[in-house]
């Protein structure tokens, strides 16, 4: 395929996605919910087809010596697919988010002012190794009246193509525009920048994957970008913090499957910490298969438990079951260190002191701050109506948990009295 053919193919996909978005305006919330349910049902009866395609991707990834974490994220199971179906069915059951009316932040004289939520337009999801994200993002987009363009990177092309085809079958069954969900194969657009640099036809780009991948895609984007964050979350262990609480916070944060978004990978230890509980924690984590690292001071104290962490590791995500420990002078120093080294999307403190918890909560510049509770991330939480695609650490309207609100924008309506 020539570069001209690839460019023409990309334009066709984006034009069709734009047309589908405009057509969705004529469908009500019940229609869109019915389509999300139809996509869920189409996926549910196609597990064998998806897993077969996924097997091809796994073979390719092994031949390419892909990183272990990417292979783990890539490998689909019936359980992961069933969880995706469950998320889509829950999305279908939620009230129409476009019917939400919010109070305006300010009012005009002699007029009533309010905000109505509206869809964004055409959303692009650019991701590596998470095939089921294609279906979840499709549900979020369709529920909010947006169209979605998928661009997988790495070795997930067969899985993405199969999932996209099945989602489009669901849209066809529901009699909604099939181009509401489309996939751009790597052979059609080998250069991702051709897609994410298209500000005239895309209204939002969501890069999802390793932090280095997300940053690379974000730097190439000309449309608005919503960066998903992962890993490198910090925990400050106060001398007033309970050992069992710290242990539970660390272990539970690594439970998310396949991507423990809020995994605690760094622990800052207060100077007044008793060595005995720290040894018990290190022993427990080692027994559970964690790899443990530390700064020079702690490695000297606990040579049987810790290996020395390089200086550049404190600002990077491990993305595996690795936790690094570091001493800190005091809470103020810990806050400054976290603000300059963590990913900034989910940081924690373990303490029995209200004053310390308040100082930490106000001082740490993170999207989510957890006090004496594991920062466990779940796309499909048991309680409430909220569902989440991921977490973002960027500043602005879409900071924090990426829910349905991230796929909508407010329109302010100013209504005066009729003079007729």
UniProtKB/Swiss-Prot annotation:
Function: Catalyzes the NADPH-dependent reduction of L-glutamate 5-phosphate into L-glutamate 5-semialdehyde and phosphate. The product spontaneously undergoes cyclization to form 1-pyrroline-5-carboxylate.
Enzyme kind, highest EC tier: oxidoreductase
Superkingdom field: Bacteria
Keywords noted in UniProt: Amino-acid biosynthesis, Cytoplasm, NADP, Oxidoreductase, Proline biosynthesis
One GO term of the biological process aspect: L-proline biosynthetic process
EC number of this enzyme: 1.2.1.41
Organism whose genome encodes this protein: Synechocystis sp. (strain ATCC 27184 / PCC 6803 / Kazusa)
Pathway of action: Amino-acid biosynthesis; L-proline biosynthesis; L-glutamate 5-semialdehyde from L-glutamate: step 2/2
Bilayer-crossing regions: none
InterPro entries listed in its UniProt record: Ald_DH/histidinol_DH, Ald_DH_C, Ald_DH_N, Aldehyde_DH_dom, Glu-5-SA_DH, GPR_dom
Locations listed in the record: Cytoplasm
Family the entry assigns: Belongs to the gamma-glutamyl phosphate reductase family.
The protein's name in its UniProt record: Gamma-glutamyl phosphate reductase 2
Catalytic activity: L-glutamate 5-semialdehyde + phosphate + NADP(+) = L-glutamyl 5-phosphate + NADPH + H(+)
GO molecular function terms attached to this record: glutamate-5-semialdehyde dehydrogenase activity; NADP binding
GO cellular component: cytoplasm
Main location: cytoplasm
């Amino acid at each position: 395929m020539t570069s001209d053919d690839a460019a023409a193919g990309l334009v066709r996909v984006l034009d069709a996605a734009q047309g589908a978005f405009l057509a969705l305006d004529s469908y009500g919330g019940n229609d869109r919910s019915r389509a999300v349910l139809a996509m869920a049902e189409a996926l549910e009866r196609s597990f064998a087809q998806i897993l077969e395609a996924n097997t091809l991707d796994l073979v390719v990834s092994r031949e390419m010596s892909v990183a272990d974490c990417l292979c783990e994220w890539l490998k689909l199971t019936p359980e992961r697919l069933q969880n995706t179906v469950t998320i889509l069915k829950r999305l279908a059951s939620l009230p129409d988010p476009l019917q939400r009316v919010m109070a305006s932040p300010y009012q005009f004289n002699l007029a009533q002012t309010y905000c109505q939520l509206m869809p964004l337009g055409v959303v692009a999801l650019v991701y590596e190794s998470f095939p089921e994200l294609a279906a979840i993002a499709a549900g979020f987009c369709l529920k909010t009246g947006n169209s979605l363009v998928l661009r997988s990177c790495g070795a997930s092309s067969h899985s993405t193509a199969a999932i996209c085809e099945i989602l489009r079958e669901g849209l066809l069954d529901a009699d909604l525009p099939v181009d509401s969900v489309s996939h751009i194969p790597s052979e059609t657009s080998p250069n991702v920048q051709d897609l994410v640099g298209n500000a005239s036809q895309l209204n939002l780009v969501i890069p999802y994957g390793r932090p280095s991948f997300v940053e690379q895609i974000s730097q190439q984007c000309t449309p608005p970008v919503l960066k998903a964050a992962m890993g490198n979350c910090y925990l400050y262990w106060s001398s007033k913090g309970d050992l069992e609480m710290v242990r539970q916070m660390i272990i539970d944060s690594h439970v998310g499957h396949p991507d423990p978004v809020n995994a605690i990978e760094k622990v800052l230890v207060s100077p007044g910490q008793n060595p005995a509980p720290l040894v018990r924690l290190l022993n427990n984590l080692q027994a559970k298969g964690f790899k443990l690292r530390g700064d020079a001071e702690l490695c000297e104290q606990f040579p049987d438990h810790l290996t020395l962490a390089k200086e550049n590791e404190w600002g990077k995500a491990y993305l595996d079951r690795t936790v690094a420990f570091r001493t800190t002078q005091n809470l103020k120093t810990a806050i400054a260190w976290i603000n300059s080294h963590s990913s900034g999307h989910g940081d924690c403190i373990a303490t029995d002191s209200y004053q310390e918890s308040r100082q930490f909560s106000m001082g740490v510049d993170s999207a989510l701050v957890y006090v004496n509770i594991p920062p466990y991330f779940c796309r499909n939480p048991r309680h409430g109506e909220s569902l989440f695609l991921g977490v973002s650490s960027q500043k602005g309207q879409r900071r924090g948990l990426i829910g349905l609100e991230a796929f909508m924008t407010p329109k302010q309506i100013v209504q005066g009295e009729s003079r007729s």
